[in-house]
């Protein structure tokens, strides 16, 4: 079940030792073994006491082995160790395999030099809660293979073992669901060595999830119909005298424990009326007392023999067709969210933070591909795969919850330097995706529950009819906001609440009139303040790509007055501004449609960079030309910055490829791997492509270092001739990247280790695609067209 470390044994010939070797005195046995092994070994630091039927070790025995560094007591019958065992101050390796320990002896935590501990094939259920400073700083390898560990909750103290690198948990009874959660939180492809994966992954998961959820006890449907409440005792057993009580109403519950304490009369509302049940003088409640009333006897008997519905875990059935439609809606939401978050992560300057999001996105991509395959199978085959669909959707939703948590935790790192237009688009994409999730939930939910949610938001929603809890984002403020409730999975909130935060409704967010006219006073989104930081609040009179020449002045006027005048005066002021804008537009010449389209497209390209591009006003030919130049200049800056990121990513991929190719060469030299006639030329082609990429990276990086500052030194590279040279270098660089991706994919089938590069290769492919889009919008495209056109 769990990845294991390699077997460690102190004696390779131990299997040939007699299994029935016995000794009545452990001291005599230890002395004789010491004498025997001292003759064969000059060091005297290694002692093997294997399969000697030792049942206990005395303080006297410890005195004989005080200088031992490696000790093996495997295949004995030990159940405890003496307190004097801590006197083994040099002990570094201890093998207690195949003994009878039911818990880890506390005295082992007091061994000052112990680094490797093998406790496999015992009956241990948990790690000790208290970990000494010796273990915190020294323990590197711990084997609990073939024990009685039933949950990773029992290993919570593993988070204190700072040096632990290898943890063996194979052949325990840990639920697969818990291991899946650990693997989902820390995927295998995060660069962790396989033998160290479980030690790091479980420790990381337990650190970030200190309070793991405890499964709720299941209640039988018959008990629910009869109005009884089942509660398990601490040991999991069911006691009829403690667990049966009558549920009086929807708001109150009379439990058995309350009836045991109180000697007063308790009023209980039944299905047909109200009765008073008096507890006995001793306070004990008899579980059968309820049936002594003939009024209820026949009724409850009839309820108790009603047939149970043939459903697993009490879930309500939905048709396969409904489930498929809902999964398609969720697939759309997953895809949109993934693309939006990927762009946000690509802009993050803190790569150590961004790599966590990228890792989760890669996991989402993998599960999404699996979801698409399962949906295709359901369409092409007669068999249904409902459980697989549900499991994949829940796994992806869990990953998105973790991603949103990371975005909220590092909010400023991801969003502080981003352009406002892009943040608005990102927010809108998430809102639309959540709305589609709500549509999927509504589609498979019962009609009465869906209609009831219009008047009162339910506490729990689910994507299938399972009892998967989720919270809702409710709209607030204003009549329009109260008409729609937007629900999302889990406690996911993109933006932290502040005094000026107000969650917009779907109608307010999707209002075309507000967006097109620039009047976004009803849309609370992010807006930059005077210091460049982001605050939450409404955007007043935002200037967009189709505003006229006076819009810049109007926006400044509104910003100046919005903090000093009342709301009614502000509305009148906005109305007068709108009238003046219409009057000025009536006397202005009609704008050229091509120019308008190009500027709108240029402004929309903000989603691939964090450089602010403000669409300029268009009042005439000269103004249009100057504004077009400004847009091109800003797009060029975007291009330089994105290319700089690509150069760094190519360097990372190059180093990884070089490392793997070197390993292949070394393995081939040592005879561990044979280079076939087909593999050798593939590796040569890949090596040559990487060399070309690094040469072009060097040339391009030299130019980018001069162009990015955008000062007087960059002018020498802004002539038509130099721009054409830069264009050719960029094109060659992008072609080489495509060749690297293609050649690496070809070699992957023969060299499986290259699969570890997939996340970085995927990111490189995506950002390269973004570069091609920006390159077509930049001024370099026009230079290349003019150079290639016939005179």
From Swiss-Prot:
SMART domains: LRR_TYP (SM00369). GO terms for cellular component: cellular bud; cytoplasm; incipient cellular bud site; mating projection tip. The keyword Repeat applies. GO terms for biological process: budding cell apical bud growth; septum digestion after cytokinesis; signal transduction. The modification Phosphothreonine is found at residue 214. Its main location: cytoplasm. Residues 544-569 have a biased composition (Polar residues). InterPro entries: Leu-rich_rpt, Leu-rich_rpt_4, Leu-rich_rpt_typical-subtyp, LRR_dom_sf, RAM_signalling_pathway_SOG2, SDS22/Internalin_LRR. Residues 8-19 have a biased composition (Basic and acidic residues). Disulfide bonds: none annotated. LRR repeats lie at residues 43-64, 67-88, 90-111, 113-134, 138-159, 163-183. It is found in: Cytoplasm. Keywords: Cell cycle, Cell division, Cytoplasm, Leucine-rich repeat, Phosphoprotein, Repeat. Pfam families: LRR_4, SOG2. Residues 1-28, 454-506, 534-569 are annotated as: Disordered. Residues 469-486 have a biased composition (Low complexity). Required for proper cell morphogenesis and cell separation after mitosis. Functions in the RAM (regulation of ACE2 activity and cellular morphogenesis) signaling network and is required for proper ACE2 localization and CBK1 kinase activity. Present with 892 molecules/cell in log phase SD medium. This is Leucine-rich repeat-containing protein SOG2. It comes from Saccharomyces cerevisiae (strain ATCC 204508 / S288c). The lineage of its organism: Eukaryota, Fungi, Dikarya, Ascomycota, Saccharomycotina. The gene is SOG2.
